[in-house]
UniProtKB/Swiss-Prot annotation:
Broad EC category: transferase
Subcellular location field: Cytoplasm
Organism: Rhodopseudomonas palustris (strain ATCC BAA-98 / CGA009)
Protein name: Ribosomal RNA large subunit methyltransferase H
Entries under Gene3D superfamilies matching the protein: 3.40.1280.10
Keyword Ribonucleoprotein: no
A Gene Ontology molecular function term of the record: rRNA (pseudouridine-N3-)-methyltransferase activity
Pfam families on file: SPOUT_MTase (PF02590)
Assembly, per entry: Homodimer.
Residues reported in the UniProt entry to bind S-adenosyl-L-methionine: 76, 108
Primary localisation category: cytoplasm
UniProt-listed InterPro entries: Alpha/beta_knot_MTases (IPR029028), RlmH-like (IPR003742), tRNA_m1G_MTases_N (IPR029026)
The enzyme's E.C. designation: 2.1.1.177
SUPFAM superfamilies in the record: alpha/beta knot (SSF75217)
Length: 160
């Protein structure tokens, strides 16, 4: 199963990008041994439309254009379900075992995600009730994906 993060906005050079890349690379090393075919991050350009609904619609269209048939869509949203690390790992493991071709994680822009896009998601996740900057959400998601792989592998990184 291939994993893809679609993130609205760019992650500029700096410590956040370095940390994000570190977790992505760590996952690639371990994930391939677990039957995952890689983890990619694609950045979606932020819409320049004047009104929030138009911005969300443009960004949603760009996101949907990159979601392959048969893939599981997971949105990151403050209204989503807060999953513990072991539950998240178990879910990724189930999708892998069911031979889902891909899991697509979507991180919205400043206006959030279009409601129609959120409804298409098989899972909507949150990192608690707080609103996080998309740069931090990307790093946190990459860390949780790496942590999930370590849980599935029985690696000591996750000690809870």
């Amino acid at each position: 199963m291939r994993l893809l993060i679609l993130a609205v906005g760019k992650l500029k050079q700096g410590p956040e990008r370095e940390l994000a890349e570190r977790y992505r690379a760590r996952f690639d090393d371990l994930g391939r041994k677990l039957g995952f075919r890689g983890l990619d991050v694609h950045e979606i350009a932020e819409s320049r439309a004047r009104e929030a609904p138009a911005r969300m619609a443009e960004e949603a269209a760009a996101i949907i254009a990159q979601v392959p048939d048969g893939a599981v869509l997971v949105t990151l949203d403050e209204r989503g379900q807060s999953l513990g690390s072991t539950a998240f790992a178990a879910q990724l493991g189930r999708w892998r075992d069911e031979q889902v071709p891909g899991t697509i994680f979507v991180i919205g822009g400043a206006d959030g995600l279009l409601p129609e896009l959120r409804r298409k998601a098989k899972l909507s996740m949150s990192f608690g009730g707080a609103t996080w900057p998309h740069q931090m959400v990307r790093v946190m998601l990459l860390e949780q994906i790496y942590r999930a792989a370590t849980i599935l592998a029985g690696h000591p990184y996750h000690r809870a």
